[in-house]
């Protein structure tokens, strides 16, 4: 079959990374896969085994820019027929919808109502109306059950138009990459956070909890340097205890070497880093945010979940996780079972075959 996978760019976010893995996985199964981006920007390489196409050197994000991109996408896909077009992230979803191509599915990678809740009231109303108009008539694939529930309850999407397909993970490949040499990794014990410096990711909460926990470990942040983040670290007096280690194309040695991985977001869709850290044998603590962490951390692993926006609870959970033994192997295997690559790729093939 022929697949076209489309997103804004290859920036360092989880949605782009997951879409690239879907593309590579489908290509490895012998399918013809075109990976298309609006603009040439980002940290990730083009997915292996795919034809890579860029619509513009720099994408205009306004009314006219979206329509120019949609025209280019329409022309390119008309000349390169496909069995399924999968777009992800709202900007790319809008461009793909404007292109009016057949067999188009939007992959929803975040909890949209939680994203909207952060906005001022007037802007939140406009954003909600925009999403209802965009997603109200298209088939959707949510990355977690929480995202699917959000689409149905908050945006009025009919349940029969929303499927759930988790992000695919090749655990053998993750563990092999985790074993690669990593001379940049600190020799001293450390706690790890992976995620761009953005309000959603709550570095302010992380730093407040880390300062309060008073742990012997360093805190390592895998994110590009940012003046705002540096200033925030200084305000907490943590300049000597926090390392900004930039974006890492291979974060897995950093995960494997960490005493603990912390996720403290206000909202997610299906946080890849929790699954990847568990696959690397690392303890995890996470805010119980919408959506994904509670689906991943079930049973005894749910002890690592804390309320959102509670630095005291996060500090206590960090101390408790570091004092406890690592989770038993059978618990980790059970937690990871729903997230293997094969079930996800099977599901995408089934959607393409049914269109």
Task: Please place each PLM-identified region on the residue numbering.
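Short hydrophobic beta-strand element within catalytic cores of glycosyltransferases
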Residues: 283-287
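Membrane-proximal helix-turn-helix segments that form the acceptor-binding/catalytic region
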Residues: 71-75, 122-140
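Short His-centered aromatic/hydrophobic patch
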Residues: 86-93, 108
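N-terminal strand-loop element at the rim of the active site
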Residues: 5-13, 17-64, 147, 224-227
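Aromatic "clamp/platform" in nucleotide-sugar-dependent glycosyltransferases that forms part
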Residues: 247, 266
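A conserved mid-protein helix/loop that constitutes part of the nucleotide-sugar donor-binding site
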Residues: 16-21, 189, 193-212
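A short, active-site helix/loop in glycosyltransferases that binds the activated sugar's phosphate group
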Residues: 137-162, 169-171
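Conserved acidic donor-binding segment of nucleotide-sugar-dependent glycosyltransferases
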Residues: 299-312, 319-325
